[in-house]
Amino acid sequence: MKWLQIHITVDQEQVEFTETLLMSLGAVSVTLDDAEDQALLEPLPGETPLWNKVIVTGIYQQDEQDPIDVDTLEAFLKAQLPDVPMRHEELEDQVWERAWMDYYEPIQIGEKFWIVPEWLEPPEADATNIKLDPGLAFGTGNHASTFLCLQWLGKTDVKNKIVIDYGCGSGILGVAALLLGAKKVYATDIDPQAVLATKQNAELNGVLDRLYVGLPEEFDQEFKPQQADVLVANILAGPLMALAPEFAKLLKSDGDFALAGVIEEQVVDVSGVYSEFFDILDVEKREENWCRISGKRKTTN
């Protein structure tokens, strides 16, 4: 079977209409991608986070007995969406199945880590190689905030320590900590798919026996009343600020922490909230204004 992809570049205001239009014409799926390499920032309450320019891609099955007339389909779409860039391509089944896999290559992060898609061989066998299924959930090492957290973990002493990975996504940070010798990682995420992905990626790396992962309410029951030696949270500024008092309870006095998912303009606000409970020792910035805030839990009496 062949597949037909229609790519349409529209303004943010046209996205919903374009999605609905493609689905009404029989698309088996519709995906959204950034058309201008922009950072997707945290939305205000009630807003949908989208880029200014969006590539909307509809995917159609091409039945050999009754194929889609591409010219007719594009003519109809152009009548509904005049003056917008549009292109199409046809993919064979085997190309379609592997297209997303071909996008990924091993990524080196700092001096310690290689992030290696599970179907590829590590470039350096003696490095700390994190095997990953990039299709499972957010967090592959490509995003600046994930990179910053991994870089920090590589410089932080986690050996034989209890580590919390809050907002675990793919589980990449928790797996990294375990490969560096952490005694136990407690991971949590609000997304059930992330919980599953974290388990699967931990199993890929042979560290599942030292990992606990669950939804926040399950995590609360499992972890309390313990305290961790290290806490890393790669989420967004709003949730991070709301969670500051909770993180203060979860982390031991003088424990290490790192926060990411924060842009430069939000650093002052986030640091201000955390300064009540934590000593801010470092702010590291990477491309697209993404920052990492790190430091230590203040000593409590």
From Swiss-Prot:
Enzyme class: transferase
Record-linked Gene3D superfamilies: Vaccinia Virus protein VP39
GO-annotated biological processes: methylation
Organism field: Acinetobacter baumannii (strain SDF)
GO cellular component: cytosol
Protein's name according to its UniProt entry: Ribosomal protein L11 methyltransferase
Places the protein is found: Cytoplasm
Molecular-function GO terms, alphabetical: protein-lysine N-methyltransferase activity
Predominant location category: cytoplasm
Taxonomic path: Bacteria, Pseudomonadati, Pseudomonadota, Gammaproteobacteria, Moraxellales
Family: Belongs to the methyltransferase superfamily. PrmA family.
InterPro entries linked to this entry: Ribosomal_L11_MeTrfase_PrmA (IPR050078), Ribosomal_PrmA_MeTrfase (IPR004498), SAM-dependent_MTases_sf (IPR029063)
